[in-house]
């Protein structure tokens, strides 16, 4: 625990960078997960699934 404190939380600048980086990765993971769930629920109804019929 002391190693994490000394590397990330001791200085305000590294603490801010750690927060920004973790927010970025959390947002990406949430976005990818929600898109996968949405596409799984709506499989067969999305444009990418039916556009072959209309081209």
Curated annotation (Swiss-Prot):
Keywords assigned: Electron transport, Membrane, Mitochondrion, Mitochondrion inner membrane, Respiratory chain, Transmembrane, Transmembrane helix, Transport
Matches recorded under Pfam families: UCR_UQCRX_QCR9
GO terms for cellular component: mitochondrial inner membrane; respiratory chain complex III
Chloroplast intermembrane topological segments: 42-55
InterPro entries: QCR9, QCR9_sf
Superkingdom of the source species: Eukaryota
Annotated transmembrane regions: 16-41
Keyword Glycoprotein recorded: no
Topology relative to the membrane: Single-pass membrane protein
Mitochondrial matrix side: 1-15
Gene Ontology process terms (BP): mitochondrial electron transport, ubiquinol to cytochrome c
Keyword Electron transport: yes
Subcellular compartments: Mitochondrion inner membrane
Family: Belongs to the UQCR10/QCR9 family.
Self-association and partners: Component of the ubiquinol-cytochrome c oxidoreductase (cytochrome b-c1 complex, complex III, CIII), a multisubunit enzyme composed of 3 respiratory subunits cytochrome b, cytochrome c1 and Rieske protein, 2 core protein subunits, and additional low-molecular weight protein subunits. The complex exists as an obligatory dimer and forms supercomplexes (SCs) in the inner mitochondrial membrane with cytochrome c oxidase (complex IV, CIV).
PANTHER family per UniProt: CYTOCHROME B-C1 COMPLEX SUBUNIT 9, UBIQUINOL-CYTOCHROME C REDUCTASE COMPLEX, SUBUNIT X
Function recorded in the entry: Component of the ubiquinol-cytochrome c oxidoreductase, a multisubunit transmembrane complex that is part of the mitochondrial electron transport chain which drives oxidative phosphorylation.
Protein name (database record): Cytochrome b-c1 complex subunit 9
Organism: Drosophila melanogaster
Protein encoded by which gene: ox
């Amino acid at each position: 625990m002391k190693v994490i404190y000394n590397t990330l939380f001791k200085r305000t600048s590294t603490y801010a960078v750690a927060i920004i980086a973790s927010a970025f990765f959390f947002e990406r993971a949430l976005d990818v997960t929600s898109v996968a769930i949405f596409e799984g629920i709506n499989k067969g109804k999305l444009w990418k699934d039916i556009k072959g019929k209309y081209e």
